[in-house]
Amino acid sequence: MALLKSKPTSPGKRGEIRVVHHDIYKGKPHAALVEKLKKTGGRNNQGRITVRHIGGGQRQKYRIIDFKRNKDGILGRVERLEYDPNRTALIALISYKDGEKRYIIAPSNLEVGATIQSGADSPISVGNCLPLKNIPVGTTIHCVEMKPGKGAQMLRSAGCSGQLVAKEGVYATLRLRSGEMRKIHVLCRAVIGEVSNSEHNLRALGKAGAKRWRGIRPTVRGVAMNPVDHPHGGGEGRTSGGRHPVSPWGLPTKGYKTRSNKRTDTFIVRGRKKK
């Protein structure tokens, strides 16, 4: 993995910084693990915009990822590492002894030809998946389940990892990158190591068009709109909004707490660190 700064042959290239992976597979994905992905443009089945700033971009095919890691006791070999346009992390194609192939989120330092396995008896090595009760305290983990058997839901993006800091009764305590300490059931599974492509946050796209290739449309400021479109809109000349910052629907933004799921507050031992 390396950061490549382009020569300033154009204004767009001047600010571009790319993450280059020399060990990545250059061919097409495994056909049996690929599905069609339809563009929505951020619209629902009524044609109304439900998610802003989405539209256009290159076509992608969805790679089916094995988040459950339930092939216990069967050794798998890393056939290749691949780019996945649907996520920030790299993915690895695993070929199992019984002939089945699956994609997984590739951890850092997982090399082509390495062997991985799942199950309670698996050794504590990068890429192996075990229940939390079988992982030693202090281990770095990623792809953590929130309900036993549901599949990984936490710590799946590039460079993400958490640390197992305690085990007490039927719950284990995890420390997340945000500083949050959270209880997870000990039968939930996690993968050893850190998610690959940790330099993803250092890249710079360089130009607006690179965002459009990814299907991301521009974000217009509220003060640049008309009163019908936004609470900050209107006014003669340039204005500063005249009120505390709000969303297009009038809800306070910039620090306003939106979490209302009090039912799961009991599992949060300590909240996120304030920036």
From Swiss-Prot:
UniProt KW keywords: Ribonucleoprotein, Ribosomal protein, RNA-binding, rRNA-binding
GO biological process terms held by the UniProt record: cytoplasmic translation
GO terms for MF: rRNA binding; structural constituent of ribosome; transferase activity
Region (Disordered): 223-260
Coiled-coil portions: none
Family: Belongs to the universal ribosomal protein uL2 family.
Subunit text: Part of the 50S ribosomal subunit. Forms a bridge to the 30S subunit in the 70S ribosome.
Function according to Swiss-Prot or TrEMBL: One of the primary rRNA binding proteins. Required for association of the 30S and 50S subunits to form the 70S ribosome, for tRNA binding and peptide bond formation. It has been suggested to have peptidyltransferase activity; this is somewhat controversial. Makes several contacts with the 16S rRNA in the 70S ribosome.
Protein name per UniProt: Large ribosomal subunit protein uL2
